[in-house]
Amino acid sequence: MSERIFVTGGCGVNGSWVVRDLLERGFEVSSFDHSSDTSLMPDLRGAFELLVGDIRDGALVSRLVHQRKPAAIVHLAALVGYPQGRPDPKLVYDVNLGGTLNVLEAAIVGDVPRVVFTSSKSAYGVVTGAHARPTYQPVPETHVGLPAPASFLSMYGHAKVAGEGLGFNYCAAFGIDFFALRFATICAPGKLARHGPMSVHSRLIENGMLGVPTTFGQGGDERDDIVYVRDVAQAIGRAVTTSHRGAEIYNVGQGRPFGLKDMATAIQRRFPGAVCNVGPGYDFMKVGFGAYNVLDISKAGAQLGYAPQYDLDAMVGDYVAALERFGITPMAS
């Protein structure tokens, strides 16, 4: 009988690919999500167990985990924006931090030896010195940035850092393995529909597919690390299966700087008529602070065997193929 992995947020933009990767690795998967929407994984319906519930319900999470006795928990469930379009710090922290605490408690109750936590580049806050623009020296896991200005992004980052701290302390107290993966900016099919126009690379690709011009008034000089969702899933799968033990943080990205114009060029190779206009300067997402960086991925390479498989051209090609395969209509934005 195959080992089972318990995945929170398994119907999401990233989680759907994690479920797919784990199934391909031969695991059985229980996916726990607040929604039963499997539109990003129509090819997998019936191939995994779908559980619907609220990550804030610690008793429910613990009961489901205890019943299934998984070999590991992969925790992706999180809010990635304000659900009602207005600031709600309590909700953000209840879900993004309280949910992590519930998962760790469930691991102890269910005697689960390993938790893989999806963290983020936002854990670095505002990177400084040579790691910042214009040099973009790759950021190691040991780097401590400046606190980001108050915003959803700063709350998201705070919860990720605090979640990492919880995991390290649970590892020390109970001996479970805890691996936190800090992802670069993720490009994924379905992200535009689920997460909105802040999904700038999805905007570029889907507008290119539709022949709709995309214009950014600023940001042509900005660089950022971009990772494709299949590489995200690959890294998580490696963290689930590694023989490494203890508590660790790993950066996951391509480890190289890219600009919007680089992505536009890759899209134009696929769709020669695609038009993308990018003005000069920095901060194409207009977040107001240095949220852009390049990650040092050498530790993940050395300890997990991680190596990115999708450059920009492969990213665009697979993104388009996935939309077509899953019957997802591209959106103009």
What are these regions (language model features)?
Residues 101-155:
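Conserved Rossmann-fold NAD(P)-dependent oxidoreductase catalytic core, especially the SDR/UDP-sugar
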Residues 11, 129-138, 168-223, 229-234, ...:
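NAD(P)-dependent short-chain dehydrogenase/reductase
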Residues 5-25:
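N-terminal Rossmann NAD(P)H-binding glycine-rich loop of SDR-like oxidoreductase domains
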Residues 71, 90, 94-101, 109, ...:
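Conserved internal alpha-helix in NAD(P)-dependent oxidoreductase domains
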